[in-house]
Amino acid sequence: MKPLKTLALMLALALTLTACGVISSDDGPTEVVGASQPAEPQETVQPEETAPQPAGKDPIQTEPVRVGALKGPTAMGLVRMMSDDGVNSYTLAGSADELTPKLIKGELDIACVPANLAAVLYNKTEGQIVTLAVNTLGVLYIVENGGEAVQSMADLKGKTLVAAGKGSTPEFGLRYLLEQSGLDPDKDVTVDWKSEHAECVAALAAGTADLALLPQPFVTVAQGKLGNGLRVALDLTAEWDALDNGSAMITGVAVARRDFVEQNPELVDMFLKEYAVSVDWVNENTAKAAELVTANGIIESAAIAEKALPHCNIVCLTGQEMFEKLSGYLQVLAAAAPESVGGALPRDGFFYGV
C-alpha cells in the first residue's frame, strides 16, 4: 500500500475505532515475546498432533507470528500460547486503535479485535483483511449500583449510563436492543461515553454513575470494588437471544492480513490449531489460567480473573461455524446501522476456510 494511502487510512481509522478497555491502565501496548512465564504442567492438556505436512515441508514452526490482542476476553484465550510459546510474539493493548495501525502497516500479522471492526477494516482496506476465528461471544451487561429500577431494556428510558466502546460492538449492540424495545437511542437514553471500561468502573465506585454498560471481566472487577450493592440488571446476550432473529451476539474475532494468510497457509492453520487448544485449556483450568492472565498483565488480580473467566464466553470458532454466527450478526448490524460494518457487508473472501 502506498505511503500516502496508508497514512490516510490510519487517520480514518483513528476516527472510527474505539477502546475495548483495560483493567490496569498502561501508557501503551505491552510487548510479550516468547515465553513470559514458565509453562504450566503439561498433563492437564495434551496438545493435538501436528497435521501431516506436504512433502518437503518442515513441521516445526520457525517463523514467528506477530499477534496483537486487547486486554480482556480477547487476550484471555491466548494466555496458554503466550506462556508456552517461544516463537511467536504478542502485543497487548488497551484499545483497538493501538493495534489496527500496526496490522495495516504489516507490524502485526494477526489481531484480536471487536467483531464489527473486522468488517470495517475489510471495507477500509478494500478486502485486505481476513477473519480467522470468532474468539468471544456475548459478554455485555447493564449493571446497576444500589437499586433495582432496571428490569428490562424499556426501563432504561430516561436513564443515563456510562459506557466505553463507542463505534464498536458495545455501542451498536446497545442501540439495536434499545430500538427493538421501542426506544430511540438518541432521545430516550443518555450514554456518557468513556475511553476505557476501567473509567466506567471508576465512575460507579465514585458514585458519579448508577448505571453502566460493561463487559466481562469488568463486571466482576466492579463487583469486587462495590460488593453486593452492584447487581447485573440485564444480560445483553440474553436480550439479543430473546429476539430470535437468527443471529448471535458476537464480541470479538481474530483477523489477519490477507497477504500474510496467502503466503503462510500452513502457519495460519498451525496457529488456529494451537489457539483452539489454548482456549480449551483456559476454559477447563480457570485457576491456572487466572494466574497466567495476571502474569501477562491482563487483570491485576488472579482471584478476580478466576471468577470472571467462566462468564467471558471465550471460544475459538472457525470455518463454517464461524461463518454462520458472524455473518448473521453482521447482517443484523448492517440492517440497523450500515456504518457499523463499514458501509457494506464483507464478501465471502472475508471468512477464512469457508
How would you describe each model-predicted region?
Residues V261-A336:
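Secondary-structure end/capping motifs
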Residues R80-M81, L140-V150, A248-E266, T318:
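A bilobed periplasmic-binding-protein/Venus flytrap-type ligand-binding module shared by bacterial periplasmic
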Residues S327-V354:
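Conserved C-terminal helix/tail region of periplasmic/extracytoplasmic solute-binding proteins
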Residues G28-P38, Q42-D186, V191-W193, D210-Q216, ...:
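Short, glycine-/small- and polar/acidic-enriched structural segments
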Residues N116-L117, T125, A198-L292:
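Pocket-lining segment of extracytoplasmic ligand-binding domains
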Residues M1-L11:
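Positively charged n-region of N-terminal signal peptides that target proteins for export
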Residues G21-S24:
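Bacterial signal peptide processing site
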Residues L17-A19:
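C-terminal motif of bacterial Sec signal peptides marking the signal peptidase cleavage site
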